[in-house]
Regions:
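N-terminal redox-cofactor-binding region of secreted/periplasmic oxidoreductases
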Residues: 1-257, 263
Length: 265
């Protein structure tokens, strides 16, 4: 998002990121993928509550604590949301969120080596590649699935999303191709983007019900930063609501947690 915003030369952008650099080989080397998602240095370390349907087990919920976020610690498998989900959103009232509306944006981000150009992007910053298919087990797996009554597809990010077939991966020239590599690092070269690493956001600062700034800790020091245009809370599906709740935005029912709720959502 910061990359797109800095394309407009009128604006400068600041990013507050609690994590650090992604230079380590455990992040950039695809075969080391299991390490960063299990390291406190790169992972927030969230876990679920005991799951009743799983005999009380507690599951790990890795979330990236490094530039690039979870795209720097995930398994690098690239899967779009299902087209029918986007269409359902639009049918439910989210105008402009149907799959025909979002498809151009998927294509704009992609630089995919496979797939039909009517469905896949070929010139975007996010490289998407296929692995080698010379192992006979690859074809055997797909054939076994077909014999069991499942569908097969050559491109699950194309026209037919359902089925067994080759995987798309965010890997380029043998390295992980994260959001940091695809978007952040090129944007940092423009001098329109300032990145604050090791910056732990505490809350959004409001004035007259309008977000004006951010309160954060930076290397142990309390700091505040103010925006002249907009503030975007893009901390992921767990940390974004957490920040908003600490800022007084959320359900009134959370007041028993000593969270001030000034703006009910």
């Amino acid at each position: 998002m910061a990359h797109r915003l800095t394309e407009d030369k009128k604006y400068s952008v600041a990013i507050l990121e609690f994590g650090g650099n992604d230079y380590g080989p455990l992040i950039q080397m695809p075969s080391a993928l299991s390490y960063p998602m299990n390291m406190n240095l790169y992972n927030w370390g969230y876990h679920t509550e005991p799951e009743e349907g799983l005999n009380g087990r507690i599951l790990a919920c890795p979330r990236g604590k490094v530039i690039g976020g979870s795209s720097s610690i995930n398994g690098m498998i690239y899967v779009r949301g299902n087209a029918s989900d986007f269409d359902y959103w639009e049918e439910s009232g989210a105008s402009g969120w149907g799959f025909p509306d979002v498809l151009p944006y998927f294509k704009r981000q992609e630089n995919s080596e496979a797939g039909d150009e009517s469905w896949r992007g070929k010139n975007g910053p996010l490289y998407i590649t296929r692995g080698k298919r010379d192992n006979p087990l690859n074809e055997a797996l797909v054939n076994s699935a077909k014999e069991a009554g499942f569908l097969a597809t050559e491109d699950y990010n194309g026209f037919q999303q359902e089925g067994f077939g080759p995987a798309d991966r965010t890997i380029w020239k043998g390295s992980r191709w994260s959001a940091a590599n695809a978007y952040l690092k090129p944007a940092l070269k423009t001098k329109k983007l300032k990145l604050f690493k090791k910056a732990l956001v505490k809350k959004v600062i409001f004035s007259n019900n309008e977000a004006k700034g951010i309160s954060f800790n930076h290397y142990g020091l309390h700091k505040e930063i103010y925006a002249s245009k907009e503030i975007i809370c893009s901390a992921g599906s767990i940390n974004s609501p957490l920040i908003l709740q600490r800022s007084g935005v959320g359900p009134v029912s959370y007041t028993h947690l000593t969270l001030p709720t000034n703006r009910e959502v």
